[in-house]
């Protein structure tokens, strides 16, 4: 691939780069993000345990992402499953006041271990996206909290980002109502 001056979109933000990056979009079957990076000329791949629904199986690696994290990537964007870590699931973690559901806790710790594979990956640029986690999970401190309404979508959903080697996102189109 030839090197071209491109505009790199990092989750909606514009960064000018003069490189073609090797990009892994983990836990993404829709290919919405990978298509944006491909359109900018990057060597981008989605990976998920599900088949892709975005129409480009040639850009999709169906299977476990773990071995891929040992490869060289310039950027990893990960959307790990949040089912057992999210604060919204606290009612299931504590079915009775003061009592933790052991099965749910074990699944939460498995989910944390999977999350940490991305967080600790040997890659210069990493973004991990997830909703607000329960404190009991013990995830590393987030880098930033964003809301869809800060970027032109009329929704409220507190989203946490863990960033490595990337700038914080700046709101681009704040909706007030």
List each language-model region with its residue ranges:
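Extreme N-terminal basic, low-complexity initiation segments
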Residues: 2-4
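Conserved active-site and SAM-binding loop architecture
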Residues: 7-177
């Amino acid at each position: 691939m030839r090197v071209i001056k491109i505009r790199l979109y990092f989750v909606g933000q514009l960064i000018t780069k003069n490189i073609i990056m090797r990009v892994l979009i983990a836990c993404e079957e829709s290919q919405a993000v990978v298509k944006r990076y491909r359109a900018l000329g990057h060597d981008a791949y989605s990976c998920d345990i599900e088949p892709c629904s975005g129409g480009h199986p040639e850009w999709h690696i169906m299977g476990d992402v773990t071995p891929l994290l040992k490869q060289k990537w310039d950027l990893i964007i990960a959307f790990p499953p949040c089912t057992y870590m999210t604060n919204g699931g606290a009612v299931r973690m504590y079915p009775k006041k003061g009592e933790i559901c052991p099965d749910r806790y074990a699944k939460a710790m498995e989910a944390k271990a999977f999350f940490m594979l991305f967080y600790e990956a040997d890659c210069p640029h990493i973004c991990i996206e997830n909703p607000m986690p329960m404190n009991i999970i013990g995830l590393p401190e987030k880098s930033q909290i964003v809301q869809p309404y800060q970027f032109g979508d009329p929704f409220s959903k507190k989203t946490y980002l863990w960033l490595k080697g990337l700038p914080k996102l700046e709101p681009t189109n704040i909706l007030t109502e």
